[in-house]
Amino acid sequence: WPGLLETMVRNLRRQEDRIRIFESGRVFSSQNGMSVERTCIGGAILGLAFAGQWDGARTGVDFFDLKGDVEALLSYGEIAHSSRWRSTENVAALHPGESAEILLQNKPIGLAGKLHPELADYYGLEQPVYLFELDLEEALARKIPHYKSVSRFPALSRDLSVVVSDEITASQ
């Protein structure tokens, strides 16, 4: 997440008040003394939940905005309905009371939560930042939607047929 956080800081310095960013790439880690490589997607949100409301409301993002974004992403693989979220407190970069593990068939495929206050201070972030990371290989190993060709016929904006008796006049 360091790259995402640095990008957020850069955008905040340019007076952006609503930031939603993501990146994808390979992540390397060590498990049982072996080097493991995974393809992941990570994202971060900060600032206003909605751009320019007519009533002037300025509601900030929260955990549920992040959860909605992650579930929308999972819906492309048609697995959002089968994913579960479980509270977790053992991720050093995330706030212990506002973090979750994302599970698919009881197997962890990602993490999501609020940036830990100490890290927020380190980066100089005064607003709450919410982050997620998904293992793309695990998420995409599930059902992938298939392409459907576009219809040859244009969409109709309206189509109305009314059948009436010949005895009825237009004025009736």
Located regions from the model:
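Extended beta-strand-rich architecture
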Residues: W1-Q172
